[in-house]
């Protein structure tokens, strides 16, 4: 949620227009919050949860296909590699934000750039702007 006045950062199930996730299983966990026709922007990275690490379970197959079958519009890419291309794997969040910005035609690029400048320490701004731009181009 964003805007001049946010009354609560929590949304009800079935109301999210977008879900951004750092890995596919995370997207699957939160899909019930997505509205019909909503979009999921997810990194294709797989992070094994503890049951997979211990051998008690296998990482679920075909997550992107399952998300699409559930009615989500899925934009799945290797955003981690894009962040590394920008200069740091830690920038994957900004890469995802850059990708998200492509779906908001009514928010000018300059506003996104100003927001980055407002929250990112100066020594990391160049990296974050590069990550954001690469995300937009993904």
Regions found by a protein language model. Name each.
Residues 1-138:
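Active-site cofactor/cluster-binding pocket
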